[in-house]
Amino acid sequence: MNGVLTITADDLAFDTACLALPAGEAVTIVLVNADSQPHNVTIYTDSSKGTELFAGEIIEGGETIEYEIPALEAGTFYFDCTVHPAMNGSVVVS
């Protein structure tokens, strides 16, 4: 990884269920919204969504955005689209 990870939202799904990020390094996530619905990426400590680690701006269908994710410690976290919570997965930081 060169510090940039691209994910695509299409047909109410992300193209991956697992985001692998390096521990202790800030990264850029590029969200490509190929859907007609609005989407975003939000990262939480776990699937209960108790603590938000990052909240991405919601973008409309056809748009692309770069999110600057701050450095995270090693661990397994959770991400979803706050508009469509069934669009979710794990964030593995190592």
Regions from the language model: what does each represent?
Residues 13, 59-94:
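Extracellular/periplasmic metallocenter environments
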